Amino acid sequence: MYNMMETELKPPGPQQTSGGGGGGGGNSTAAAAGGNQKNSPDRVKRPMNAFMVWSRGQRRKMAQENPKMHNSEISKRLGAEWKLLSETEKRPFIDEAKRLRALHMKEHPDYKYRPRRKTKTLMKKDKYTLPGGLLAPGGNSMASGVGVGAGLGAGVNQRMDSYAHMNGWSNGSYSMMQDQLGYPQHPGLNAHGAAQMQPMHRYDVSALQYNSMTSSQTYMNGSPTYSMSYSQQGTPGMALGSMGSVVKSEASSSPPVVTSSSHSRAPCQAGDLRDMISMYLPGAEVPEPAAPSRLHMSQHYQSGPVPGTAINGTLPLSHM
């Protein structure tokens, strides 16, 4: 029986050494294995174990029966079948593996199995970093997509900033004043057209500008000056009544409002400490002199932007 096994197993032996184990791999794998052997002639293969001896013929049969089955699936099925075999069925293949090992030791007495641990660890790292490796091209595409999205977002932000400047929703009061001064002074637009195009935007600009200024003044002085913004919000209604002259006078008078508000801060500096303390007290303990200061500031800003004149007796900047 063993002689029959030897005669059956010996002819495929040279095929494996020459073909490089191309039992179910096909001509391409055999050619690649042959090329690898030519590239590394000093490389000596390990002797086959009992499972390899048994699975060599079984793999060929299964590959012929199922040509579309993948080699990994064939290996899984062969491993399951090998576990189901009894010891008596495995014995001839075990003895054949022992004989091949003894023959290998005679042919290569100095052979020592050196596992390629570096490649195995690299393979393990590749397995663990496989999602990263798969995501690496995707990551580049994501990075490029982020770059494109950042570029698009920058373009959108620029567009929104320009739209915000058109509507008066800018970040600083200086830019708001520049926008205010820039609209009626545009050479291609007359005052009437500017007033028709920008009445509501000018309303928003003045509200934002004076609200931003009064918030800082309220924190410093401790007196509520919200009436100032309300009185200034009434000026665009006057601008709607007389289109051209009021728009120019409002634009020219809006920068001096800042200076006048800074001048109007001087009388309140004597009671700054008291006003700051009263600002943090409850509503019932707020002293009554806050109302005159509120009335004073409201009267001051209501009397400011009169059409045709400017604040503090200065001439309007209509010639600009």
Swiss-Prot record:
GO annotation terms (biological process): endodermal cell fate specification; eye development; inner ear development; negative regulation of canonical Wnt signaling pathway; negative regulation of cell cycle G1/S phase transition; negative regulation of neuron differentiation; negative regulation of transcription by RNA polymerase II; neuron differentiation
Keyword Nucleus: yes
InterPro entries, alphabetized: HMG_box_dom, HMG_box_dom_sf, SOX_fam, SRY-related_HMG-box_TF-like
Residue ranges flagged as DNA-binding region: 44-112
GO cellular-component term (any): cytoplasm
Sites of the Glycyl lysine isopeptide (Lys-Gly) (interchain with G-Cter in SUMO) crosslink: 248
Sites of Phosphoserine modification: 254
Keywords assigned by UniProt, alphabetized: Activator, Developmental protein, DNA-binding, Isopeptide bond, Methylation, Nucleus, Phosphoprotein, Transcription, Transcription regulation, Ubl conjugation
N6-methyllysine: modified positions: 45, 120
Gene3D superfamilies noted in UniProt: High mobility group box domain
UniProt cross-references to SUPFAM superfamilies, sorted A to Z: HMG-box
Pfam families given in the database record: HMG_box, SOXp
Protein name: Transcription factor SOX-2
Domain notes: The 9aaTAD motif is a transactivation domain present in a large number of yeast and animal transcription factors.
Localization per Swiss-Prot or TrEMBL: Nucleus
Processing and modification events after translation: Sumoylation inhibits DNA binding and negatively regulates the FGF4 transactivation.
Keyword Transcription regulation attributed: yes
Organism expressing this protein natively: Ovis aries
